[in-house]
UniProtKB/Swiss-Prot annotation:
The reaction proceeds by a bi uni uni bi ping pong mechanism. ATP binds at residues 29-36, 147-150, 184-187. The lineage of its organism: Bacteria, Pseudomonadati, Pseudomonadota, Gammaproteobacteria, Thiotrichales. Keywords: ATP-binding, Cytoplasm, Ligase, Nucleotide-binding, Pantothenate biosynthesis. Beta-alanine binds at residue 60. One of its GO terms (cellular component) is cytosol. Belongs to the pantothenate synthetase family. It comes from Francisella tularensis subsp. novicida (strain U112). The gene is panC. It catalyses: (R)-pantoate + beta-alanine + ATP = (R)-pantothenate + AMP + diphosphate + H(+). This is Pantothenate synthetase.
């Protein structure tokens, strides 16, 4: 696996080694888990070359503590990527991505950007879209692989690619879950054993609910030891965000299926 630590190196690799080949791109913030691995395996099966990025983007964190405590396990991530036979790891610094600071930003005006995560985390989608645009311009992939767990993010990136005439196809892959139904997330690494027990209780509640009374469901989730931030039906999906201790988790799933594995 080739590791590119800056944009110049990646451009050199792209120009010299992967001309005329189909490129799949999996953007991550590191702390890789089986959800990321499923995206990478999908990309490997459909492309000649796979690029994975690891960049914890500071501009999409509205909570400084969340940014500071985001899991960092670069050496372990490199081992995982090497075991998957990833072709290129792009691991830029903040200075590479924001050489002059955060002077220009994408400000989404879509309704979906202002509800749920957009309402709960002001500025999050602006920072996310800005860095995704930069990463797509740098890597110039044929295919971009995203997880369904970040459903709002996926919808906004689709609009970004459309509005900026980016010649990249978006492939959305199913959410990977633990047997309890809890979606895999890098933030799960910050959960204690007690937190995990609470999460399992919450997902037992969710699996058994028909989502006809969200107020009652809210009380059940909070009584299980979580602090629900929001739960909402949107079209045929259920969206929710909650805290277990200091760890914030999000999920979405089809109302008919619930959080099934």
């Amino acid at each position: 696996m080739i590791i590119a630590d800056n944009i110049k190196q990646l451009h050199s690799i792209r120009n010299s080694l992967i001309k005329q080949q189909k490129i799949g791109f999996v953007p991550t913030m590191g702390a890789l888990h089986n959800g990321h691995i499923s995206l990478i395996k999908k990309a490997k099966s459909e492309n000649d070359v796979v690029i994975v990025s690891i960049f914890v983007n500071p501009t999409q964190f509205n909570n400084p503590n969340d940014y500071q405590t985001y899991p960092n396990q670069l050496q372990q991530d490199i081992q995982i990527l090497e075991s998957l036979d990833v072709d290129v790891l792009f691991n830029p610094s903040e200075k590479d991505i924001y050489p002059d600071g955060n002077l220009l930003r994408i400000e989404p005006k879509l309704e979906i950007a202002n509800i749920l995560e957009g309402k709960s985390r002001p500025g999050h989608f602006s920072g996310m879209l800005t860095v995704v645009l930069k990463l797509l311009q740098i890597t110039k992939p044929n295919n971009l692989y995203l997880g369904e767990k970040d459903y709002q993010q996926v919808m906004l990136i689709k609009q970004l690619v459309k509005d900026f005439f980016i010649n990249t196809k978006i492939i959305v892959c199913p959410t990977q879950r633990q047997p309890s139904g809890l979606p895999l997330s890098s933030r799960n690494k910050n959960l204690t054993s007690t937190d995990i027990e609470i999460a399992n209780k919450i997902y037992e509640i969710l699996r058994q609910d028909d989502f006809s009374n969200l107020e009652e469901l809210t009380n059940k989730i909070n009584s299980a030891g979580a602090k629900l931030q929001y739960i909402q039906k949107l079209n045929n999906r259920i969206f929710l965000a909650f805290y277990i201790g200091k760890v914030r988790l999000i999920d979405n799933f089809l109302k008919e299926t619930g959080p099934s594995c």
